[in-house]
């Protein structure tokens, strides 16, 4: 039996940052209280509690003197207000992608626009998003629920539409198409994070190559359940939280088994499940070697990378960087030197690009990339080779001046 571990399996940078921060506070002997379970992984939460962390349902439950950790899901504005009223110290581990949605929600309220949120109304991330707008808001889980809102949507002067960061990518694309056709006054923001997009895309591809798929992660984890849905469309798929839940008989007859894991799944649990599945992983490749093969390669300024376009706006496009869990941003000025160029004319969703890394940001997991710099490097190389080979090159004259032409 061959076992293939997805490159995107395991902690995303947002979850990793929240977990790392909380462990560091506990190691310093600080009294820590998290608002809700820090992540949707019972094993990690239990370990944190064994080291002294307290899980509280609300700010009212936080003991005096405790330092509050706001989890990556984020919270509504009223929660920040309560923390301030109680004068509690707090550490904000909200995922930057979620923070971006909070700002959009606040803007919707300020501009009198209705806020549409694609997601699970009971999920803490969605509840936090809703808590940042002061205007009318509706949450829908799928196209059918969105269609039921149409009579109300047609009465709105302005609509802002966002998605939970872990929402199903295909479902979001379908909902966006509906909004574009039915609501000309809707401003649609692509807010599914790159880690979610890349994880679902890899699960889609991997599940089509495998006889079985094992999805490791919390049963209450939104992104884990989305991965299970994606994988189950193409092959037999199962969700396990720990190695103890894996029924080895379920694997009987499978030649190739794919393994992926949700954003809240630590590598230790992935290792336990893999070891439970087989003592001979990929021709005796150890878990450490297998994990190393799946881990993202470091990015640095000047590195040339391949990326796929996830979303396009008038001012920038968002890309998924091959071999990385980071998101890439390409500004219009870094896509073309043409002052009249429009981003939607330059690239489309799913286009594959060669880009140069301009700046990395490990804290937020968002990197700045450039197409024009890649073209400049490639152009210089082509010119050098042409000079050496005596090749005649052609180009467009953009401007004539006293010194010649540009």
Predicted region positions:
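The feature marks the mature, well-folded catalytic cores of soluble enzymes
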Residues: 1-280
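Single-stranded RNA-binding regions, centering on S1/OB-family and related RNA-binding modules
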Residues: 279-406
């Amino acid at each position: 039996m061959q076992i293939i571990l997805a490159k995107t399996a395991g902690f995303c940078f947002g979850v990793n940052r929240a977990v790392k921060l909380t462990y560091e506070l506990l190691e310093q002997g600080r009294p820590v209280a998290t608002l809700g379970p820090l992540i949707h992984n019972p094993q990690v939460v239990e370990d944190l509690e064994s080291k002294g962390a307290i899980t509280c349902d609300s700010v009212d439950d936080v003991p005096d003197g405790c330092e509050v950790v706001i989890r990556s899901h984020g919270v509504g504005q009223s929660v920040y207000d309560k923390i301030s009223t109680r004068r509690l110290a707090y550490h904000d581990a909200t995922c930057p992608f979620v923070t971006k949605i909070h700002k959009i929600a606040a803007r919707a309220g300020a501009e009198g626009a209705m806020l549409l949120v694609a997601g699970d109304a009971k999920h803490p991330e969605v509840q936090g998003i809703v808590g940042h707008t002061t205007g009318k808001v509706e949450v829908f889980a799928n196209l059918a629920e969105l269609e039921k809102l149409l009579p109300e949507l047609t009465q709105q002067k302005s609509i802002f539409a966002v998605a939970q960061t872990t929402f199903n990518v295909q479902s979001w694309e379908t909902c966006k198409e509906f909004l574009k056709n039915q609501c000309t006054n809707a401003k649609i923001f692509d807010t599914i994070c790159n880690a979610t997009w890349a994880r679902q895309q890899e699960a889609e591809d991997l599940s089509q190559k495998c006889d079985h798929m094992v999805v490791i992660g919390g049963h209450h984890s939104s992104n884990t359940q989305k991965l299970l849905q994606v994988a189950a469309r193409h092959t037999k798929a199962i969700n396990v939280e720990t190695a103890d839940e894996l029924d080895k008989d379920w694997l009987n007859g499978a030649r190739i088994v794919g393994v992926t894991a949700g954003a809240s799944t630590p590598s230790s649990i992935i290792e336990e499940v893999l070891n439970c599945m087989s003592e001979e992983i990929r021709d005796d490749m150890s878990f450490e070697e297998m994990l190393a093969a799946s881990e993202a390669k470091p990015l640095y300024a000047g590195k040339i990378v391949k990326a796929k376009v996830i979303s396009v706006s008038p001012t920038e496009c968002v890309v998924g960087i091959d071999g990385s869990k980071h998101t890439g941003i390409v500004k219009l000025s870094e896509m073309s030197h043409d002052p009249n160029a429009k981003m939607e004319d330059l690239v489309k969703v799913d286009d594959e690009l060669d880009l140069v890394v301009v700046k990395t940001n490990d804290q937020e997991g968002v990197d700045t990339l450039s197409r024009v710099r890649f073209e400049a490097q490639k152009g210089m190389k082509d010119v050098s080779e042409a000079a050496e080979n005596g090749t005649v090159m052609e180009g467009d004259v953009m401007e004539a001046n006293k010194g010649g032409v540009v």
